[in-house]
């Protein structure tokens, strides 16, 4: 059954890649996925350009099987970043022979969004379909146990998958396919969470992690800094040089040590990444702007970091967004215990995701590799999708 699910997932992913779905422009791809789900007989609801489906609400599923049990959210995003200008093939309609030559493998789905985050989208959809099928865990007729077959060599996970009986299902499942993730839009998980949060106990955020489980991810705090001086003529040494103020502040900021150290992520990371000043060679600049990129840990709120940095420098600091917080899995949570029991490698992720927009316990885990994201010639291996489906099913069937 896994091979059939994988084939369906790959076909869907190729169709999704062909539909441009930049953040804030997901309507077409959302409509396509809704049509696909409708053809598969799945019950779902569309909220803007987000899609929500619940296992206990599917045809043939006995909702009583989930009474008193927690709910696990599977979440992946359907939007993409803009394509790089350096693609070796068309990012939406790739020549597969050319892409295979560039990448060095025919076992691929190439194109924008294939890896981030289409692979997680289709793998989670395939997992959801499996759970709603007569081979799945919550079917009313309680079918006989059915093996999913062996896992591919070297792909990890269990070698045999056997669905549980209805009585053995440990959690209801809510599948959420979100929009606007790449640009932190208010109509994606940011707004949707307020509607669904009371239904959800814990979550798996689908992002390309090689199916390792991120039990922590750094946040993101971008600060625009402005040093104010007084303009004057350079020949007469007039004025107050804003560049000199900025340089002193930059030295202070980059040498600053945050006291609280995360046991999972280590120190807060801070880098100055842009600087701009001056209008002419003979004018002392009265303004110098620079940008600070900060990757917080769970030890500090973004507000705390901003206040601490403002207290040690003269430049005016303004945060672009204070909501991109860091996240960490609850110690000894069901998610952590299940990952450990299944031998799934855990790590701390340097990148952000929809995890920062929810406030329940979560891990981040999905097929593909983050190192391929937001770059030219994006792709995902087909065997990664197959392994993603297997691992998601295994995780759900064994959640502790």
Protein language model annotation of sequence segments:
Residues 1-114, 147-148, 163:
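Acidic/His- and Gly-rich active-site-bordering loop/insert found
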Residues 4, 153-156, 208, 213-215, ...:
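Metal-dependent amide/peptide-bond hydrolase catalytic core
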Residues 10-11, 15, 39, 68, ...:
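Secretory-pathway/membrane protein signature
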Residues 33, 121-131, 192, 246-249, ...:
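Buried hydrophobic packing segments
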Residues 58-68, 133-170:
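Intrinsic disorder/low-complexity segments
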Residues 72-74, 176, 202-204, 363-365:
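Hydrophobic/aromatic beta-strand patches that form the interior of the parallel beta-sheet core
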Residues 77-81, 181, 369-370:
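Short glycine-rich anion-binding loops that position phosphate/pyrophosphate groups of nucleotides
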Residues 108, 118-142, 161, 165-217, ...:
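Acidic/histidine-rich catalytic neighborhood of metal-dependent amide-processing enzymes
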């Amino acid at each position: 059954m896994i091979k059939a699910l994988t084939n369906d997932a790959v076909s869907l992913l190729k169709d999704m890649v062909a539909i441009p779905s930049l953040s804030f422009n997901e309507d077409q791809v959302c409509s396509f996925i809704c049509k696909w789900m409708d053809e598969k007989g799945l019950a779902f609801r569309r909220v803007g350009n987000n899609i929500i489906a619940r296992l206990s609400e599917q045809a043939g599923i006995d909702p009583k099987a989930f009474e008193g049990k927690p709910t696990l959210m599977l979440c992946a995003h359907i939007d993409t970043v803009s394509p790089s200008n350096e693609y070796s093939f068309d990012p939406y309609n790739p020549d597969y022979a050319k892409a295979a030559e560039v990448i060095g493998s025919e076992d691929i789905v190439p194109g924008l969004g294939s890896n981030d985050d289409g692979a997680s989208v289709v793998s989670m959809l395939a997992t959801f379909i499996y759970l709603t099928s007569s081979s799945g865990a919550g079917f009313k007729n309680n079918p006989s146990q059915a093996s999913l077959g062996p896992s591919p060599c070297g792909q990890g996970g269990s070698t045999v998958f056997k669905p549980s009986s209805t009585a053995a299902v440990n959690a209801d499942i809510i599948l959420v396919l979100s929009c606007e993730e790449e640009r932190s839009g208010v109509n994606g998980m940011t707004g949707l969470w307020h509607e669904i949060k009371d239904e959800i106990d814990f979550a798996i955020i689908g992002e390309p992690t090689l199916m390792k489980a991120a039990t922590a991810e750094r946040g993101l705090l971008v600060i625009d800094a402005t040093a104010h001086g007084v303009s004057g003529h350079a020949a007469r040494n007039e004025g107050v040089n804003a560049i000199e103020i900025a340089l002193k502040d930059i030295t202070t900021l980059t040498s600053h040590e945050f006291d609280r150290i995360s046991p999972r992520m280590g120190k807060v990371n801070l880098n100055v990444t842009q600087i701009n000043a001056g209008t002419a060679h003979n004018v002392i600049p009265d303004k110098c702007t620079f940008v600070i990129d900060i990757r917080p840990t769970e030890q500090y709120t973004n507000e705390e970091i901003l206040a601490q940095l403002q207290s040690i420098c003269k430049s005016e600091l303004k945060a672009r967004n204070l909501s991109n917080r860091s996240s960490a899995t609850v110690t000894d949570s069901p998610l952590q215990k299940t990952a450990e029991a299944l031998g799934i490698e855990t790590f701390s992720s340097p990148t952000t995701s929809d995890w920062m927009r929810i406030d329940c316990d979560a891990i981040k885990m999905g097929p593909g590799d983050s190192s391929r994201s937001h770059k030219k010639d994006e792709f995902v291996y087909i065997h990664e999708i197959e392994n993603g489906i297997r691992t998601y099913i295994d995780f759900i069937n064994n959640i502790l």
